Design a protein with these regions (language model features):
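Gly/serine-rich nucleotide phosphate-binding loop at the start of the catalytic core
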Residues: 1-51
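Short N-terminal helix-initiation segments at or just after the protein's N-terminus
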Residues: 8-20, 50-57, 106-112, 198-203, ...
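Glycine/proline-rich, flexible active-site/cofactor-binding loop segments
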Residues: 20, 26, 33, 111-117, ...
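Generic hydrophobic, aliphatic-rich segments that mediate packing or membrane embedding
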Residues: 21, 55-56, 68-72, 106, ...
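Hydrophobic, Leu/Ile/Phe/Ala-enriched alpha-helical segments that form helix-helix packing faces
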Residues: 29, 60-64, 156-163
Length: 356
């Protein structure tokens, strides 16, 4: 029942265009499953990062056979839950893109991308499991006993132990700490491409590093389409630094500083590899808009966790449908919506004819 029910539940998450509830699913299957059976499934299942890996492992092994560069992409996001009661996983988190705190479920994911296919191989919910008194306000607040950088390293270790075949780790500046760089290069013997903030300090030579002659990277003589080798403060190995220009939505010009640990890669290769990171933005968007991540009204931590991972399972199902039907997730969702409208119109016409 459990395996069949997770398959049915993920179908429901993909098919739904409103709140996803136990009552709604029970009604959809004409009562073949009761409300209590569905709530019991959500309350007693143990969906987590380990079960996610077992679910996607056969697909990952097939994808590893494809030609091209395989990458692991790390990023976090927040599933907004403004009306849910606060607990260890539903709490206030700083949203660095919106520059303010948001109430919801913060999660960190590891996405394996190769040949245009994206598969989540690890995901963790950020738990603020410690309460403390803010000395400035005197109010009780929550914090996590483990940092996101520590969690990232833990997830990388698990992924390495699972023998996922990848070439680079990609992440934005929020995860580009020197500790993460050293861990990937020295402990895992892998390469990385990270963005850096413009005020990150670097030395132009090993001698400058030893003498403490570090300068902000935005002051370095770096042109587009070129790279220089630098020593980021805190590292004992050089990285290739490139400066990439891009156009924002408001037509203003932006700059990305990319640091790559692979000294054999040139500007074009580094920027092409980092371009793969944007698939994680599509992952987050599809989770929220196509897999009903934010549409469950559950109030209990356990059911919230299980719904979260079920939404990721639903994303994987959409990715498989994308491959089979040559349609992106939003095109698939649109087709479902149009067919639902057609069925609704047909039913309405039948009802109208009965009145004639």
């Amino acid at each position: 029942m459990g395996k069949n029910l997770i398959d049915l539940y993920t179908d429901y998450l993909i098919s739904s265009f409103s709140q996803t509830t136990a009552t709604g699913l029970s009604t959809l299957v004409d009562g073949c499953l009761s409300h209590d059976q569905i709530t019991t499934f959500l309350a007693e299942s143990d969906l987590d990062s380990k079960s996610l890996w077992l679910h996607v492992k056969p697909m990952v092994r097939e994808l590893e056979k494809a030609k091209g560069t395989g990458v692991l992409i790390f990023d976090d996001s927040i599933a907004v839950k403004p009306y849910s009661d606060e607990n260890e996983i539903v709490c206030y988190h700083w949203d660095h893109s919106k520059k303010h705190y948001i109430k919801g479920i913060n999660f960190l994911n590891c996405l394996f991308e190769k040949d245009g296919i994206s598969l989540p191989v690890s995901a963790e919910i950020i738990e603020k499991d410690e309460c403390f008194i803010d000395p400035k306000t005197g109010k009780e607040k929550r914090r996590s006993s483990i940092t996101k950088n520590q969690l990232m390293q833990k997830m990388l270790t698990v992924t390495q132990n699972n023998r996922v075949l990848y070439d680079y780790v990609l992440a934005d500046s929020w995860f580009s700490s020197a500790d993460n760089m050293k861990f990937i290069k020295k402990d895992l013997h892998k390469e990385f491409v990270f963005t850096l903030k413009s005020n990150r300090l670097a030395a132009l030579s090993f001698e400058d590093k030893l003498e403490g002659k570090f300068v902000p990277i935005d002051s370095l003589p770096l042109n587009e389409d070129s790279l220089i080798s630098v020593y980021i403060k805190g590292l004992d190995f050089p990285v290739s630094l490139v400066k990439q220009f891009f156009t924002n939505k408001d037509d203003s010009e932006g700059v990305l500083y990319l640091a790559c640990s692979d000294s054999s890669s040139d500007y074009s290769q580094i920027t092409a590899i980092y371009q793969k990171r944007w698939s994680v933005e599509e992952f987050h968007k599809s989770l929220k808009q196509n897999a009903s991540l934010e549409k469950s009204p559950t109030h209990v931590k356990k059911t919230q966790q299980n719904h979260f991972f079920a939404s990721i399972y639903a994303f994987v199902k959409l990715e498989c449908l994308k491959i089979k039907n040559s349609m992106n997730h939003f095109a698939i969702k649109t087709r479902l919506y149009i067919n639902a409208l057609k069925a609704s119109m047909k039913e309405l016409h039948t009802m109208s004819e009965a009145l004639a």
